[in-house]
Amino acid sequence: MKSKLINAAGPVAVFLVFIALWYVVAYSLHNNFSPASGKPTIIPPPHRLFEDFHGPIRERIFTALLISTRTAFTGLALSAFLGIIIGIAMSQAKWIERSLWPHLIALQVTPIIAIVPLMIRLIGANFTARVTVTVIISIFPIVSNTLFGIQSVHPSLHDLFRLQNSSRWVILRKLQLPAASPAIFTGLRVAAGLAVIGAIVGDFFFTKGDPGLGQLITFFFLNNLSGPMFITALFATGLGLMLFICFGVLNRIVIGRWHESVSR
């Protein structure tokens, strides 16, 4: 119990310092917090967010949150499926790795804004386009971690399976994938945060269809509604944290009982 309190003390202290700095910055900018003044608030203090989170604004934020959650979950699911399959294929054949790896790196380093016009031409500015952006942004860490995890299996373990005349499928299923699972889950946790970023970025570029959190942030910004804009950004952060924590819990459930990186 005492160790848990000590472990929690650090994050709580950092959070309190962050809130204190937020107040200092908010008031040091000489914001006019009076709604009657007509002047836009640059950075609202934290307590102002609770005042702004009401009625129609709350309803719009929750609606946008559901839309962005659907986009992020769909994109992350596709990234996980495709990323693990591609990572496995690259680990089983060097020619596949040599053929795909340069293109995956090129896709990772290409600014998404350079791809968007082509996507609008091919797909249109719709839900599919948003999901495609999410997949492009989040798939790389899953592929790279899957490949790294499988290639990191100790050669002596491969020799042991070969002595038993095990097939490549058996080696993959009983040795490589279990040994690579910690790395795969690490990639999934990184991709979870990137999937939320992809969903938000997709909203900025694709303005048609139901507005997600990204479109709502733009709307509040253009209308000088700093409080609702900050609230929407915090909900986007919370969505990313939720996905990250979910994969952390799943990681503990799946491999926590036997792998030292989780069990200790």
What is the predicted role of each segment?
Residues 104-141, 148-149:
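Generic hydrophobic transmembrane alpha-helix motif, especially the helices
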Residues 29-77:
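Periplasmic/extracellular loop-to-transmembrane helix junction in inner-membrane transport proteins
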Residues 182, 230-264:
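C-terminal transmembrane helix and the adjacent membrane-cytosol boundary/short C-terminal tail
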Residues 74-104:
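Transmembrane-helix boundary motif in ABC transporter permease subunits
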Residues 134, 187-238:
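Non-cytoplasmic
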Residues 132-136, 169-202, 247:
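Transmembrane alpha-helices
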Residues 145-184, 213, 217:
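Short cytoplasmic-facing helical segments at TM-TM junctions of multi-pass membrane proteins
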Residues 1-28:
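N-terminal signal-anchor/first transmembrane alpha helix
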